[in-house]
Structures are given as structure tokens and as C-alpha cells.
Amino acid sequence: MERISALGLDVGKKRIGVAGCDGTGLIATGLTTIERQSFPQDVQQLEALVKEREVQLLVIGLPYSMDGTIGFQAKKVQKFAKRLSTALELPIEYIDERLTSVEAETHLKSQKKYSRYNKGLVDRLAATIILQQWLDQRRASLI
């Protein structure tokens, strides 16, 4: 299997959860949470991670509506993703991220690590779930 270096992003209005994967493409790990201030600052922070980790691809969670349609929030994420792809000169792939934040909160609560004041941890774990889903789908398609 070829080496892969991807970042998983959970893009929100206030924060971006960021996850990375090991070179084998087996395991996603939460890296950081970016507090959003402006697009140039978002790019600057992500650019540092892209260079450090030699990223080849961005995997971005797309918040489809529960009925499977692309709603207002998903369109905002797509617009941001296209700008980010251009700025970082990286391809993007989307993955359905419905309920990843709920899954992240449930996981943290089960580990007694959840705090409604630490939304950054939820965003980072949601990004990890997004990237892990993509890695699992990719691996399954190669079998």
C-alpha cells in the first residue's frame, strides 16, 4: 500500500478540528484545534501543518442534512474548502460528517473527558473520526 499523508478537517464557524494519519494510512490521530479568526490566519496555521507533515490531501467533513441533501452549512464548508484547496495547492476529498460531533461527544463522555467548555477537544475528535472513516473506506476499496 502506498504511503499517504492526509489531514482531516472538521470545519466549523468558530473552530477547525484537525487530525492527521500515520504514513501507513491506518490510524487517524487528533492534532490540534484552530480557533478561527480570518481566512488568511486559518491558511497560515494549516500551512505550517501541511509542510511539517508533508500533506498530500485534505479530507473535509461535509455536513449533509439528515435527508442527505447539501444544505446551507454544507455549502459554506464547500466554499471554504475550495478556497483552502487553492491556497494550499492541495486536492480535497469530502466525507459525510453527519453526527461526527455527537459521536465525539459521546466518546468523550464515556471516558469522563467531556466538558461543554472544551469544544476544541470535540472538534479535534470529530476531525479524527472524519479522517478515520476516509482511511477505512480507502483501505476497503483497495482490497
From Swiss-Prot:
It comes from Crocosphaera subtropica (strain ATCC 51142 / BH68) (Cyanothece sp. (strain ATCC 51142)). It is found in: Cytoplasm. GO terms for cellular component: cytosol. Could be a nuclease involved in processing of the 5'-end of pre-16S rRNA. It is an enzyme of class 3 (hydrolase). It comes from the Bacteria. GO terms for molecular function: nuclease activity. Keywords: Cytoplasm, Hydrolase, Nuclease, Ribosome biogenesis. InterPro entries: RNaseH-like_sf, YqgF, YqgF/RNaseH-like_dom, YqgF/RNaseH-like_dom_sf. PANTHER family: POLYNUCLEOTIDYL TRANSFERASE, RIBONUCLEASE H-LIKE SUPERFAMILY PROTEIN. This is Putative pre-16S rRNA nuclease. It holds the Pfam family RuvX.
